Regions:
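Flexible glycine/acidic-rich beta-alpha junction loops that bind and position SAM and/or redox cofactors
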Residues: 33-42, 128-131, 201, 250-251, ...
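Glycine-rich beta-strand-to-loop/alpha-helix junction loops that act as flexible
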Residues: 119-124, 241-246, 595
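Structural recognition of alpha->loop->beta junctions
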Residues: 131-150, 290-298, 356-371, 609-629, ...
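A short helix->loop->beta-strand "cap" motif at the edges of active sites that frequently abuts
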Residues: 111-117, 269-271, 296, 336, ...
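Acidic, low-complexity intrinsically disordered segments
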Residues: 4-238
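Radical SAM [4Fe-4S] cluster-binding motif and immediate context
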Residues: 176-339, 344-359, 387
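Radical SAM enzyme core and accessory elements
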Residues: 1-28, 35-37, 49, 72-75, ...
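Short acidic/polar active-site loop segments enriched in Thr and Asp
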Residues: 90, 237-239, 297, 367, ...
Length: 646
């Protein structure tokens, strides 16, 4: 069904019956994201314990602003808080990306069975609406500014459609200010804004032109002003413009930057900004100067590869117009840090590609270098080409391209050669020496911006102390030496940047070790030791068939699968807890999968307390329990799947 819709600003004015009508209750949910390169779990856990995630769900806050004003709306982000088991709601709206699909599916099933009207939307629903067939009552396909109010109107009249499709780009000049008041912004390191959608370039692997078109559309400066004014009283200092290319339409980008610079001066520089831009910004000194004056502290560049043949193949023409290494250094010289994405697996890539990528990344000094495998996303030109050539793996779903797997069959390497080379490259980039070398190569060119820097409220000395005691010192003498080397001959005014890079390096190193590298022999031996102790603690339940323990050593990450049947009581669970804690602490690439089957009622409270004790391991603990949500398992602390498997 293609919904017929009325513009939202007209829908909002329609008087539907009397004031005595009970407000419709809407709960919007952002499902838990599996750990990824961008999670920075180590930094959040060890350095910023009052923060739970990086970015809030801006899309849901925008959706809430598009909802009729008389509706009762709540937003839950499973990445920072548990989900309600029986919310006071009529409608459950679930958003998210491809990496969240597994959890989306579980939540849709759970809430639909409870009798709620469930709605799915977001980027993956827009790219692959057929994936949600039979899972949701309503599917929102495309940008929501027009079709979400249409759904709301239809629901109020009792005739909600099954699918609402927005085939054409919408005019962002009518997008309302997001409902930041519904977000728990204090739990995030960064707030999010959006100025534009769309990108003029057509990179073969990118889904942005498919989702948002090639003609960038922008909000007005008045809209941006209203959003900044809504954020400023919250005390947020770090703001991420989520635009896929902020300079996609340069005349309006220049006007935005001029406005932001004036706003910052007027209000004593309350914000530090970051965004995504194309690398050819380095060739526009005027625009770069405006970016710095507006208070942008970092940019994300899609460098992808230093190989010109691969860039040409991918349609990345904007990266061929200048020397990429020089371009990165231009940003440093303007006091702007660089994050970047890199890809291996292009058709022109060979076994030598990994060494070229390593040399470039090290020389560039880019610490937050997201190295991924080429992945074909549905509806992109790459996906369609590889599908025609029968080069898509059906056993791998497109999603997170940094997890060591891809649905692309490479051309000049075997699949195993590519994944092994990728894992080895990730390992090389996350050694302590490699982290330090990139810091030195960055700070050699970095010039501090003259724009005042707004701190985010964390006491720098306490964060530095945590970095040294929980990261540097625990890394051994080699790590201490690398840390001191990274600060050698560096101006003290830039030490904060070096420490930020170490925090990022430790986070990426932890993710790489857990999901990409094979565990060390020492870790395997430690696992076997504690596994035997665990089996001894649970020998009676195991002998009676009430408990099973299996160590799956050839998965990434390595999994300890523990199945607990009905008659395994709380005494046995308590005996196993300390051993499990030691095992997870010592074997840092291990994931515990706890399968609970029909536990006696008396054990439920104890299980919740037990999982709370293990909650600081976050994604490393997964609970498979059909009634996990019903029994109040905090799914923001441990990963939860509601489908039990044996």
């Amino acid at each position: 069904m293609i919904a017929r819709y009325t513009p939202w600003w007209i829908v909002q004015q329609i008087d539907l019956n009397s004031a005595s009508r009970r407000p419709i209750r809407l709960v919007l949910i952002n499902p838990r994201c599996p750990e990824s390169f961008w999670s920075f779990r180590w930094a959040l856990r060890e350095l910023l314990p009052d923060k739970r995630a990086i970015n809030p769900p801006l899309g849901l806050a925008t959706l809430a602003a598009l909802t009729p004003v008389d509706w009762k709306i709540s937003i839950y982000d499973e990445n920072i808080e548990p989900l309600p088991t029986h919310p006071d709601a009529d409608i459950i709206g679930i958003g998210g990306m491809a990496v969240q699909f597994h959890r989306q599916r579980e939540l849709l099933h759970y809430y639909r069975e409870k009798g709620y009207h469930v709605v799915i939307g977001g980027s993956y629903a827009s790219l692959s609406p057929s994936a949600y067939e039979g899972l949701a009552d309503t599917v929102i396909v495309g940008e929501a500014e027009l079709i979400w109010p249409a759904f709301c109107r239809d629901y109020e009249f009792g005739v909600p459609g099954r699918q609402y499709h927005q085939p054409d780009p919408v005019d962002l000049r009518h997008t309302p200010t997001p409902r930041f008041d519904l977000l728990k912004l204090s739990s995030y390191t960064t707030a999010s804004l959006q100025f534009s959608r769309g990108c003029p370039y057509l990179c073969e692997f990118c889904d942005i032109p498919v989702l948002f078109g090639r003609k960038p559309r922008t909000k007005t400066l008045a809209q941006v002003h209203n959003e900044l004014e809504a954020l400023r009283p919250t005390g947020v200092h770090n703001v991420f413009f989520v635009d896929d290319n902020l300079i996609g339409y340069r005349p309006r980008a220049k006007a935005l930057l001029e406005f932001l610079a004036e706003y910052q001066r007027t209000h004593n520089y309350p914000f530090s900004f970051g965004t995504e831009v194309s690398v050819n910004l380095a060739t526009d000194p005027e625009l770069l100067t405006r970016l710095r004056a507006a208070g942008f502290r970092w940019v994300f560049l899609g460098i992808e590869t230093p190989d010109t043949a691969s860039l040409t193949e991918a349609g990345k023409k904007q990266n061929l117009r200048s020397n990429l290494l020089d371009a990165v250094r231009v940003f440093y010289q303007n006091g702007i840090d660089v994050f970047s994405g890199f890809i291996v697996g292009f058709d022109h890539d060979t076994a030598e590609t990994f060494e070229r990528q390593y040399r470039f990344i090290e020389a560039s000094g880019i610490q937050v270098a997201m190295l991924g495998l080429l992945t074909a996303v549905p509806r992109t030109p790459l996906y369609e080409r590889l599908e025609r050539n029968h080069r898509l793996r059906q056993d791998v779903q497109p999603g997170d391209n940094t997890g060591g797997q891809t649905n692309v069959v490479p051309l000049r390497m075997t699949y195993d050669e590519m994944t092994a080379g990728y894992a080895a490259l990730c390992e090389r980039l996350t050694t302590h020496r490699a982290i330090a070398a990139r810091i030195r190569n960055k700070l050699r060119y970095y010039r501090e911006s003259p724009v005042p820097r707004q701190m985010d409220g964390h006491e720098p000395r306490s964060v530095l102390w945590r970095l040294i005691t929980r990261g540097i010192s625990k890394g051994g003498l080699g790590c201490v030496a690398a840390f001191l080397w990274s600060l050698c001959r560096v101006r003290p005014s830039l030490w904060y940047l070096a420490c930020q890079d170490w925090a990022a390096g430790f986070s990426i190193r932890e993710y790489t070790r857990r999901y990409i590298q094979d565990p060390s022999l020492k870790e395997r031996m430690l696992a076997e030791h504690y596994l035997s102790k665990l089996a001894h603690k649970l020998k009676n339940p195991i002998m009676n068939g009430f408990c099973r323990i299996d160590l799956e050593q050839f998965t990434k990450p390595v999994r300890l699968r523990m199945v607990i049947e009905q008659s395994c009581g709380s005494v046995d669970l308590k005996a196993a807890l300390r051993t499990l804690d030691h095992l997870l602490h010592g074997f840092r690439t291990l994931t515990l999968v706890l399968v609970l089957k029909e536990l006696p009622t008396g054990c439920n409270v104890y299980v919740r307390q037990w999982l709370d004790r293990l909650g600081h391991y976050s994604d490393r603990v997964t609970v498979e329990w059909e009634e996990a949500l019903m029994h109040g398992i905090d799914s923001s602390r441990v990963a939860v799947t509601t489908r039990t498997s044996g």
